[in-house]
Amino acid sequence: MRYLATLLLSLAVLITAGCGWHLRDTTQVPSTMKVMILDSGDPNGPLSRAVRNQLRLNGVELLDKETTRKDVPSLRLGKVSIAKDTASVFRNGQTAEYQMIMTVNATVLIPGRDIYPISAKVFRSFFDNPQMALAKDNEQDMIVKEMYDRAAEQLIRKLPSIRAADIRSDEEQTSTTTDTLATPARVSTTLGN
């Protein structure tokens, strides 16, 4: 019985390791982005902390913004906006439920290449109980913190697509340069008198 349990456990480990299964909330960050500079207007703000945490969870080494290295990709965090819309109302017309929408803009600068804009949008809703103002504020703070974490996860998940776009632009550049080199010069075939 013990032998069978060991065999089944070993088989389960081999199957999950062999099929490319990964732990939840981890992303295959491209090898060219394993060392990065995180640039933010608010380096100790909630979004910067969430992105820094996600980058470290995904094995990315972060360099100081003032580093002298110019060959390292840079993730620049931009504007964050949080909008709050009414989702439902009570019979008396007061708001019963809000939907919050967080939009985060960022850019990835790959030295010698291009600047790639990325963005993330996170939606959450919460109930507005007017009789529990303090609890409502605490719940809203927790929801906003969770939204920052989800936005950071979305931004990190978009890094592999940036690498793919970078490779695609390289291929397009090489194909256009080879096309212009391979095109023969125009030769006139008219006979003059």
UniProtKB/Swiss-Prot annotation:
A lipid is attached at residue 19 (N-palmitoyl cysteine). It is a lipid-anchor. It is found in: Cell outer membrane. Together with LptD, is involved in the assembly of lipopolysaccharide (LPS) at the surface of the outer membrane. Required for the proper assembly of LptD. Binds LPS and may serve as the LPS recognition site at the outer membrane. Belongs to the LptE lipoprotein family. The keyword Membrane applies. Its main location: membrane. GO terms for biological process: Gram-negative-bacterium-type cell outer membrane assembly; lipopolysaccharide transport. This is LPS-assembly lipoprotein LptE. Residues 1-18 form the signal peptide. NCBIfam families: PRK10796.1. Residues 167-193 are annotated as: Disordered. InterPro entries: LPS_assembly_LptE. One of its GO terms (molecular function) is lipopolysaccharide binding. Component of the lipopolysaccharide transport and assembly complex. Interacts with LptD. Transmembrane segments: none annotated. PANTHER family: LPS-ASSEMBLY LIPOPROTEIN LPTE. Keywords: Cell outer membrane, Lipoprotein, Membrane, Palmitate, Signal. A lipid is attached at residue 19 (S-diacylglycerol cysteine). One of its GO terms (cellular component) is cell outer membrane. It comes from the Bacteria.
